[in-house]
Amino acid sequence: MQIAVMTFRMHAPWVHSLKEKRMIVKSLVAKLQSKFHVSAAEIDEQDTHTIIVIGIAAIVPHHAMADSLMDEISVFIEKNCEAGILEETREIR
């Protein structure tokens, strides 16, 4: 078994309040959990309304599946989130 861990740091300059940010984060996290069956949550910068940091983790049978899943998640976030990705980290444990 492998654990795939990803972190996305994104910039959303049009967001003007924490309430607006919270709606964006909740929607993205729910979509990720539903589509990919992963654990996802906002893990940092909760008090900064223009920066979104999402952590994602999943347990997969082998390394190749972890790579494939992380590629799919990355493409999904690029296509479904208006925020620009500043940084993406990946780790397989």
Segments (PLM) and residue ranges:
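Short glycine-/aliphatic-rich beta-strand segments at the starts of folded cytosolic domains
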Residues: 4-13, 18
